[in-house]
Amino acid sequence: MQPSSGRRFTFQTSVYEEACGRLVLTSFIAERRRPGTIIKTSLEREFYRMGSLPEFPLENPFENRNRFYVVDDESELRANDWIRLYLELSVAISDRTTTDHDLSGLRIVSVAIQTMEPPSESSLTAKNATVYIRYIDFCKARCGQNLDRIAVVRRNLQ
């Protein structure tokens, strides 16, 4: 939606599943699409040539504020709703056998963001980042017990 006029615009995007159990959320196109036009692009996918997710850091990413930007304030987590989206996408693909799709029992405890730059608030909007989301899953129906977990998401925007 364009804030100044309140008009809504349609955007063309693409989301796909690379393999069973591995969801790749990709937006090849994130530009305004005019009605009746078909946009065809073949953007380079440098991000996927880099391999799988990096090894989990040896040190606790939620405690090392020299290497990671840590978000543990409730208001900052709410202001960055993309974190919740990343978490829900991660949980949704982790167990395909469940019939319980209620993700309201997830509580984000802390988020650590690693970028190539020194940690700062700008890490929240970094185009290239690895995001570690520590959360508690209260859904006993899905997991059998309350679990303290960490979701790892790599983001690459070009």
From Swiss-Prot:
Organism: Arabidopsis thaliana
Family the entry assigns: Belongs to the UPF0725 (EMB2204) family.
Database matches in InterPro entries: MS5
TM region(s), chain numbering: none
Domain of life, source organism: Eukaryota
Signal peptide coordinates: none
Matching Pfam families: protein_MS5 (PF04776)
UniProt protein name: UPF0725 protein At3g57210
